C-alpha cells in the first residue's frame, strides 16, 4: 500500500480507567523492564542508522522486533552492528537469530547474564484471532529517540483488502516505535508495531501476535541463523512468498471490465484495492477524455532501504479524442506509451526492454507492447517487470493497459503477462 511509513505516538492525556481496565501507567509499569530500543549502528563510527523498538519474550533474553529495524545489519553485517538499550539504560550487542520477511519480524538475543530477564507473554486470545473489535490496547515504543512512550488506542480487527495479514490499530505509531509491543489489558502481547498510514490520522498497523509467537517457537527448536546464511534465507523466503502469491492469484476470479469498444480482465479478490477515475467533467474541457481503472495489491515486503517488493498492479485507461485529429491523437498516445527507465541500483540491475506487436486471437485487437524487466542482484530468478499494451486500430480512441509486478520469478511473470494480454479483447 502506498503511503505506508515503516518504523512508525501521540501521548493522550490520561483519563480515569473504566472499572476492570488498568490505568495506562499500570500497563507501562508492568512492561517497562521488558522493553528495548534496538539500534542498527554504522560499524566504524557507531552512529545509529536505524532506530526501532523491541521486547523480551523469555528470561534468557530472546527478543522480538521488526525485520526492517535490523535489515541493514542482516544484509551488510560487516558494515553495521546491532545494539540494544533497555529502560534502565543497560546496553549491549545483539545476535540476530531468525526472521520472517513476509511478516516483517525478527528475533534477536541479548547477551547472557545471571539474573533472569523480565519477559512479556503473548495473549492466548490473540493467537486465535480472538481480540474483540474496539478492545482497548496500548502500544509501546521509543518514538524519535525521545524515550519509551505508551500510546492508547483500539483494536479494529484485521485490515480488509490486504493480502498481508495486519491489524488496524487506532493509535499513533511514530518512527522509532516499530518492533515494540501492543498490549491488552492483561498486559500481554496482541501485536507488534509495524507501520502507520501517511495522510491519515490514527491509522496504524500491527503484525498479529501469532506470527511472532510462531517465529519464537521455531527459533527455540532450530539452530541460530549464521550471518553468512542470511542472504540465502532471504532468497528462500522471497521465493516461497511469490510462489504462494501467484498460486493464490490463479485461484481468484477474473472478470472482463468494459472500456469503450474493448474489454480487459480485472481481478475479483478482496485483497485487491481497486479505484476508477475520469477527467470527463474537468475544466478546462480536456481534448482527450480518459476513463481509468486501477487494481493493486501491495504487501510491501521490505527487504532493504533500496529494495521493497510484493506489488502487483493492473491499470487500464480508455482514451477518446474530442478535438484531436488522427495525427495529433497518435502523438498524444506516443507520449503516454512509456515506461520509466531504471538504470539499476546496488540491489537490482538496469531494465532490459523488448517491444513488438501482438494479437492474442482473431477476437482481439492488435496491440503495441513493451516488456521491461530488471533482476535482483542478491537473489536468483527474482525480477521486477512491467508490461505496457496499447491498441492501435483507431485514430480517435485507444485502450492503454499496464501490468507491473515486483518480486516474481521469470516464469510467473511470463504467465501473468500472457493472461494480461489475452484478456484484452473486442467488446461484443
Regions found by a protein language model. Name each.
Residues 272-335:
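Secretory pathway targeting signatures of secreted, lumenal, and periplasmic proteins
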Residues 20-24, 41-60, 91-93, 203:
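A conserved glycine-rich beta-strand in the N-terminal activation segment of trypsin-fold
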Residues 213, 223, 270-272, 394-428:
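Surface-exposed amphipathic alpha-helical segments
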Residues 20-28, 94, 116, 189-262:
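C-terminal cap/linker of serine protease catalytic domains
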Residues 55-56, 172-193:
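Catalytic nucleophile loop of clan PA
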Residues 51, 58-103, 110-113:
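Catalytic-histidine neighborhood of serine endopeptidases
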Residues 19-23, 69-74, 118-165, 174, ...:
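Flexible, gly/ser-rich surface segments that form the specificity/activation loops bordering the active-site cleft
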Amino acid at each position: 500500500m502506498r503511503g505506508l511509513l515503516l518504523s512508525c505516538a501521540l501521548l493522550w492525556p490520561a483519563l480515569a480507567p473504566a472499572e476492570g481496565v488498568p490505568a495506562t501507567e499500570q500497563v507501562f509499569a508492568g512492561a517497562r523492564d521488558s522493553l528495548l530500543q534496538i539500534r542498527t549502528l554504522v560499524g566504524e563510527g557507531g552512529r545509529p542508522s536505524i532506530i526501532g523498538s523491541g521486547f523480551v519474550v523469555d528470561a534468557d533474553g530472546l527478543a522480538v522486533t521488526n525485520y526492517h529495524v535490523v535489515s541493514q545489519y542482516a544484509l551488510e553485517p560487516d558494515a553495521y552492528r546491532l545494539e540494544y538499550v533497555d529502560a534502565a539504560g543497560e546496553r549491549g550487542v545483539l545476535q540476530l537469530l531468525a526472521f520472517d520477511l513476509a511478516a516483517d519480524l525478527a528475533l534477536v538475543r541479548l547477551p547472557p547474564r545471571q539474573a533472569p530477564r523480565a519477559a512479556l507473554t503473548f495473549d492466548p486470545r490473540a493467537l486465535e484471532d480472538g481480540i474483540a473489535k474496539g478492545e482497548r490496547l496500548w502500544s509501546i515504543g521509543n518514538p524519535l529517540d525521545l524515550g519509551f512512550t505508551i500510546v492508547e488506542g483500539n483494536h479494529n480487527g484485521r485490515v480488509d483488502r490486504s493480502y498481508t495479514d495486519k491489524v488496524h490499530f487506532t493509535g499513533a505509531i511514530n518512527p522509532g516505535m516499530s518492533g515494540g509491543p501492543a498490549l491488552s489489558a492483561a498486559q500481554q502481547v496482541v501485536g507488534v508495531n509495524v507501520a502507520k498510514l501517511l495522510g491519515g490520522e490514527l491509522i496504524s498497523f500491527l503484525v498479529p501476535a501469532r506470527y511472532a509467537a510462531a517465529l519464537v517457537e521455531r527459533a527455540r527448536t532450530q539452530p541460530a541463523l549464521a550471518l553468512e546464511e542470511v542472504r540465502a534465507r532471504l532468497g528462500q523466503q522471497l521465493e516461497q512468498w511469490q510462489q504462494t502469491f501467484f498460486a493464490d492469484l490463479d485461484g481468484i476470479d477474473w472478470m472482463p471490465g468494459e472500456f469503450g469498444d474493448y474489454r480487459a480482465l480485472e481481478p475479483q479478490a478482496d485483497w485487491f484495492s481497486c479505484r476508477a477515475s475520469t477527467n470527463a467533467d474537468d475544466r478546462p474541457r480536456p481534448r482527450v477524455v480518459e476513463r481509468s481503472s486501477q487494481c493493486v495489491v501491495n504487501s510491501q515486503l521490505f527487504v532493504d532501504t533500496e529494495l521493497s517488493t510484493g506489488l502487483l498492479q493492473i491499470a487500464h485507461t480508455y482514451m477518446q479524442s474530442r478535438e484531436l485529429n488522427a495525427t495529433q491523437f497518435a502523438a498524444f498516445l506516443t507520449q503516454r506509451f512509456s515506461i520509466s527507465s531504471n538504470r539499476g541500483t546496488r540491489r537490482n540491475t538496469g531494465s532490459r526492454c523488448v517491444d513488438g506487436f501482438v494479437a492474442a486471437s482473431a477476437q482481439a485487437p492488435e496491440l503495441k507492447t513493451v516488456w521491461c524487466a530488471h533482476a535482483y542482484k542478491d537473489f536468483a530468478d527474482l525480477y521486477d517487470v512491467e508490461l505496457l499494451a496499447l491498441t492501435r486500430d483507431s485514430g480517435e480512441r485507444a485502450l492503454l493497459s499496464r501490468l507491473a509486478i515486483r518480486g516474481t520469478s521469470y516464469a510467473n511473470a511470463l504467465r501473468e503477462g500472457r493472461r494480461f494480454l489475452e484478456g484484452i479483447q473486442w467488446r461484443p
